[in-house]
């Protein structure tokens, strides 16, 4: 079970003045310790020369140090997914995650689903090694020790409670293994907020990893919360004209009004260290957000783009260097691309087409290939592609297996895969499949989940397409993750399977054989939305 609430020694305080709180936050770092490109791919040498790279822990360290110089009691939070996503995690696992997290000196951080990718055994060294509390109020674990429901910190004689949470979907989209129960987020956070309130804590922040929709639900339904700091959905929030290529998916902060009339801000800071969220909050003596011009209790708020105007902390750069030397063999060029191969969720995209094509080419006798959007972790830029780039795209050590499945069952899988799409196109990413060898037409209406496919066609050897037949068997190339219990229906429906090569090796071979890569959108997945 999670350890009980950890609090500071509390004395009876009578506070008559307002209280200003400076808060910084990041989420979904995913082992992106080095700076990234404008599209959050690998920052190439020519991009560095042009000043077109962003983020990285050395810039984070500079910004955090500068902010703490102005306010030494600045709160720094991380919304989870410390692990997984670059070659750094593939090669070194938890070691640089612990080192650089400790360098940044977080006040607290929540667990994310990918922090469980190597099970409890892979997570425990992180929980034991970091110098800040790791939080998840909705976790009951007999496997991982030391995860707390909340922590209370004293700032200028005010008590601030911080509650963590993580998506219950962790059971199906990661690998926590037995002995871990993920409870309802809203109920768990609400109960912990009540616990904190009962011992005199009246400023309460939730930090967690369940997505923008759940963040807003928490803000709406947990009456004791003052702020929600989120993660998981990689949501970019911004008020005004965005400073880079990301389109804002909502205001920063997003203000959520409770039934009582209280307003709770919700924030998130995209991903991969490209931005850091920066808030200045003002509370009255009762712990309620006050009402300045900029918003409800918010004196200032913005996600800060960590571009070339933010210098790199040289002490952190020296720490990076010792790892970079080990990684040099992975940085050999394996091919080139003439187009940017971007990862875009919930639709056909160039990166997905490339990877699915490589999987199809890995087997001589398969007709169709699938990979889930969640299995693709980074975009590829124009120019040279290195082994490091490929590992950043496919960091999970999956194999490209071939499986045999009946056509009727394949149609069921395809319907299941798109059931989470919403007509307004505002829903968070689902485990949408990128594919090769198939052409789909579908209509997404509010009430037609399970009946969205209008047409499903399979490409024939000559290049023509014909209808997918329900009574025919098909061979598919898929990533091994999708055959695991609970990850998709495929594992239960397939009638035969053959283990293949590592997905990383498959993609490297394909790039080497087909370079320079020129990928296009081909109409493989055609979706019409009816709001």
Q: What feature does the model see in each segment?
A:
Residues 19-35, 39-65, 69, 184, ...:
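Catalytic centers of hydrolytic enzymes
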Residues 1-2, 531:
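C-terminal end-of-chain detector
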Residues 3-18:
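Cleavable N-terminal signal peptides of Sec/SRP-targeted secreted and luminal proteins
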Residues 6, 91, 390-391:
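Hydrophobic alpha-helical segments with strong N-terminal bias
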Residues 16-300, 346, 350-361, 369, ...:
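Acidic, metal/ion-coordinating pockets
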Residues 2-5, 153, 163, 476:
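Well-ordered beta-strand positions enriched in small/hydrophobic/aromatic, beta-favoring residues
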